[in-house]
Amino acid sequence: MVIFSTGFNYKTAPVEIREKLAITENNYGLILEKLNSIEDIYEICVISTCNRVELYGVSNDNIEKVKEEILRILSQYSTVPVNTLKDYLFFYTNKEAIRHIFRVSSSLDSMVIGEPQIVCQFKDSFTKAKEYKAVRHILTRLFDKALNVSKKIRTSTGISRRAVSISYAAVLLAKKIFGDLKDKNVLIIGAGEMAELAAKHLHSLNVKHIFVSNRTFEKAVELADKFSGSAIRFEKIQEFLPEADIIIVSTGAKEPILKKEDVKRAIKSRKDPLFIIDISVPRNVEESVNELEGVYLYNIDDLKQVVNSNLEERKIEAQRAEFIIDEEVEKFVKWLNALKVSPIISSVRDYADKLRQQQLEKLFKQMPYLNEKERETIDLAMRSLINKLLHRPTMYIKDKAAKEGNTEVVKIFEDMFSSKWDFRKKGKNLEEIEDIVREEQ
């Protein structure tokens, strides 16, 4: 059994690749079902945000086959060739996979360390995977632990104090270029979480007015009302462009919303520069817009510079958080390693119990005069003897399994009994392990 984490994020793949891999709400179930149908995968969960498309799962030891199948499915979905995806794919197993998952849930792997959005996104991805019955007991345990680690880090370090989001980074970039924003009109296209965060930060800087547009007009009205703004119908965006000084685009559209010709017409009646920040993935503003004079277009990857300038004060707290991660990873790895030998121990105990039953049956035939109470006393004595005999080797093998690098002793223990039972049957280990995890929970 192998725990793995794989995928593409802002560190490994540019936005041009990530936007093609981004999994929409409508496609999520289809992709998850395809991944879950891979024979070598036992459990799978997918998280798709503007900064990452990642898969966390449990599989058998055939890792290369797992990687190959994942790439094939993602290539079909994104239309990006497998060989191209290979260049940007990361793939971690076991200890490093667990570490990565803990770092993601704790926002230590985020573009903006300490940003809170990832926790909700992490929970949502797990909830969806549960709905599609793609996760079972191992990933459930891992995700619960990851969220506990995240909470521990947020409460015991200052990692989330003054934490900035991508939306806030966008606002800081606007402030850096314009200086005072009090006389600036802002158009926000989109009404989701990122758009609302941007509106919140802009409102706190006393911009002149906030306009909100969304395909669902009611959502635009709802968001605009929160910040004393105005809602604009989606089909009227082009008419309003000349009035906007700052445009922040954050939608889930698959095609560009703002095109070069639209912006070109808008700037003809403007004297001041137009500042556009596209924090959507896929990008919602045509890249060629940046060719227009007086127009400044930035996408989500451009925000890295703004983000990096705000990371210094979090470095010390991040180091403290990494120590917590290291500690919790070791605990989980020990639990997992000990768990892996549980089917072996269970089979050994089953073998011992069958021997007990055989010997009792033989004994009772030889001593038919024993009454029920006497038989129960003998049975109890044999059970007690077996438990005492197996206790020390069981604890020894669990301890050796929990410590990395002690697989030889475990292998010897397994081989001693493998002639009686095949521990390597497909699915047998997983089912027994899950039973044990279920009992612990």
UniProtKB/Swiss-Prot annotation:
| Pathway entry | Porphyrin-containing compound metabolism; protoporphyrin-IX biosynthesis; 5-aminolevulinate from L-glutamyl-tRNA(Glu): step 1/2
This protein's record includes keyword Transmembrane helix: no
Task: Name the keywords, alphabetized.
Answer: NADP, Oxidoreductase, Porphyrin biosynthesis
Which is a GO BP term held by this UniProt record? protoporphyrinogen IX biosynthetic process from glutamate
Q: Which Gene3D superfamilies match?
A: Glutamyl-tRNA reductase, N-terminal domain, NAD(P)-binding Rossmann-like Domain
The domain of life is Bacteria
Q: Which residue positions hold the site described Important for activity?
A: H100
Q: Where does substrate bind?
A: T49, C50, N51, R52, S110, E115, P116, Q117, Q121
Catalysis performed (reactions): (S)-4-amino-5-oxopentanoate + tRNA(Glu) + NADP(+) = L-glutamyl-tRNA(Glu) + NADPH + H(+)
Name the EC number(s).
1.2.1.70
InterPro entries linked = 4pyrrol_synth_GluRdtase, 4pyrrol_synth_GluRdtase_dimer, 4pyrrol_synth_GluRdtase_N, GluRdtase_dimer_dom_sf, GluRdtase_N_sf, NAD(P)-bd_dom_sf, Shikm_DH/Glu-tRNA_Rdtase
Q: What is known of its domains?
A: Possesses an unusual extended V-shaped dimeric structure with each monomer consisting of three distinct domains arranged along a curved 'spinal' alpha-helix. The N-terminal catalytic domain specifically recognizes the glutamate moiety of the substrate. The second domain is the NADPH-binding domain, and the third C-terminal domain is responsible for dimerization.
Query: What other remark does the UniProt record contain for this protein?
Result: During catalysis, the active site Cys acts as a nucleophile attacking the alpha-carbonyl group of tRNA-bound glutamate with the formation of a thioester intermediate between enzyme and glutamate, and the concomitant release of tRNA(Glu). The thioester intermediate is finally reduced by direct hydride transfer from NADPH, to form the product GSA.
Q: What is the protein's given name?
A: Glutamyl-tRNA reductase
**What organism does the UniProt record list as the source?**
Sulfurihydrogenibium sp. (strain YO3AOP1)
